[in-house]
Regions:
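Ankyrin repeat domain, specifically the short helix-to-loop turn at the C-terminus of the second helix
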Residues: 31-39, 64-72, 97-105, 127-135, ...
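Ankyrin repeat boundary/linker residues
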Residues: 44, 77, 107-110, 140, ...
Length: 202
């Protein structure tokens, strides 16, 4: 019994060390813990993997070390988020490029990396996705598109980029919600004017 408890606490302590190392960009400790046998696919109670945590931080050395241990790159947490989505919303362009090179998916059901990037105005990340053929008018379960999110969050540059690549300005969610409505509800007047000029309807 004592040995089992000791092993449990030892594992928990090692996991905390790993989380701290990822947050601090301590690549040496990350590498050491992996070499000692920590499972690279270890997740927390919300299903967030070590790779997802590293993707949020954007430290390339740590990210590459974790990737060298062959984690599940396309894994999703309990909220349907991937490592690529987390790198996208933070605007970590190099991390995004590296994850794509390792097989991360640009498009999948539900929220997409493009939507995450658009909501935070991560224009360079968005451009990369669009150049690589991301589905620009893809909608999540409630019918929101990247354009609607950009309009709602007041992200003018993101909105203009999406329009440049041909986003449909008049798409409606199942409940009738449009990008123009999103802009008006949040008093994003400049975006509303841009959408109206482009022919958007409520």
């Amino acid at each position: 019994m004592g040995l089992a408890v000791t092993a449990l606490f030892t594992h928990a302590a090692a996991y905390e060390d790993m989380l701290r190392a990822i947050a601090n960009g301590d690549n040496g400790t990350v590498s050491s813990l992996l070499q000692k046998g920590m499972d690279v696919n270890t997740v927390d109670k919300e299903g967030e993997s070590l790779l997802m945590k590293a993707a949020k931080e954007g430290n390339m050395n740590v990210l590459k070390t974790l990737l060298s241990a062959k984690p599940k790159v396309a894994a999703l947490n309990s909220f349907g988020e991937s490592a690529l989505m987390m790198a996208s919303i933070k605007g970590h362009l190099e991390a995004v490029k590296t994850l794509l090179a390792e097989g991360a998916q640009i498009d999948h059901a539900g929220w997409t990396p493009l939507m995450y990037a658009a909501s935070m105005n991560r224009v360079e990340v968005m451009r990369l996705f669009l150049v690589r053929g991301a589905k620009i008018d893809a909608a999540n379960a409630t019918g929101l598109t990247a354009l609607m999110l950009a309009a709602r969050e007041g992200q003018t540059q993101a909105l203009l980029l999406l329009m440049e690549y041909g986003a449909n300005v008049s798409t409606k969610a199942p409940n009738g919600y449009t990008a123009l409505q999103a802009a008006k509800q949040r008093n994003n007047d400049e975006i509303a004017r841009i959408l109206v000029k482009a022919g958007a309807k409520e």
